[in-house]
Each structure stands twice: as C-alpha cells, then as structure tokens.
Amino acid sequence: SDFRNAAVHERQKELVVTATTTCCGYNPMTSCPRCMCDSSCNKKKKPGRRND
C-alpha cells in the first residue's frame, strides 16, 4: 500500500506542476513569476515561517 500512496502523491505533484506551468509559456496571457515554473519560489518562500 505504500507504493500506491507514493503513486498518488506523485500524481498530485504532477497536477500542481501542470497547473503552474500554464502561466510559464503554455498560456502567454497568464502572467506569473518565472520561478514558479521550476518551483524555486516555494523553496525560497516557506509559508508560516519567517527565519531569514
């Protein structure tokens, strides 16, 4: 069952990536930070935590 859970999580990740990629070239009419394409925004910005 662990493998199935992992597969589900992978699918969810892909869905998020696909939704994010819509504004990174596939849909020029949607503007968004370029770092959203490779998820570099999320790595720098940790919601709920302010330790800089």
Swiss-Prot record:
The main place the protein resides is secreted
**Molecular function (Gene Ontology), one example:** acetylcholine receptor inhibitor activity
Note on domains (UniProt)? The cysteine framework is IV (CC-C-C-C-C).
> So which residues have sugars stuck on them?
18, 20
| Source species of the chain | Conus achatinus (Little frog cone)
**Chain positions found as Pyrrolidone carboxylic acid:** 12
GO CC terms on record?
extracellular region
Q: What is this protein called?
A: Conotoxin Ac4.3a
Q: At what positions is 4-hydroxyproline found? A: 28, 33, 47
Q: Superkingdom of the source?
A: Eukaryota
> Propeptide positions in this record?
1-11, 48-52
Q: Which cysteines are joined by disulfide bonds?
A: none
Pfam families linked:
Toxin_8
The record ties this protein, via InterPro entries, to:
Conotoxin_a-typ (IPR009958)
Keywords carried by this UniProt record: Amidation, Disulfide bond, Gamma-carboxyglutamic acid, Glycoprotein, Hydroxylation, Ion channel impairing toxin, Neurotoxin, Pyrrolidone carboxylic acid, Secreted, Toxin
Post-translational modifications reported in the UniProt record: Contains 3 disulfide bonds.
Residue numbers of 4-carboxyglutamate PTMs: 14
Q: What is stated as this protein's family in its record?
A: Belongs to the conotoxin A superfamily.
As for subcellular location, the record says:
Secreted
**Which tissues is this protein detected in according to the database?**
Expressed by the venom duct.
